[in-house]
């Protein structure tokens, strides 16, 4: 079985340096909203457009003219109305909780509790904010990361998504050192690979740098031969 470290080295060689999510909590929240059902390229284009307005603070989200805000958010792809609603709901939440950054930097339990009411973020988004924004050693097992890890054999397969996520997180926790940088690197590259190459349907296996050691790809190849 391919080691996680070897897999990450190959992904780094294939994709080159990847930009991590912003570490400022509200900007990271905006990043998550733009990232929802989108591609990294579209997400980054929309974030850059909001930065140019500028509209990357809770107050500026509300002060920006609707047409300007819509034009920027539309760059992230479909679901524009849902994204706008999520941005405004998040802006309200952050204005009501000006001490959020301090709470996130406390204990992991305190950080989780601080984000519990921010429903638009979701579990993976909350964990990503805790990892990249507050240096807590959690694994943000979003759908992309979970799919890639599972296909590589990290985490026992399960038809139950929640159980699969738990299995994946346990397997990655056992395979990764406790260092925050190592966990950020794993989260960044596994999730990115799942969003652009190791797709849920019709994955781009011929170009994948992990192909020769991927048990799922081998099983598929054997089924067709």
Cite the ranges covered by each PLM segment.
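Catalytic cores of DNA base-excision repair glycosylases
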Residues: 3-224
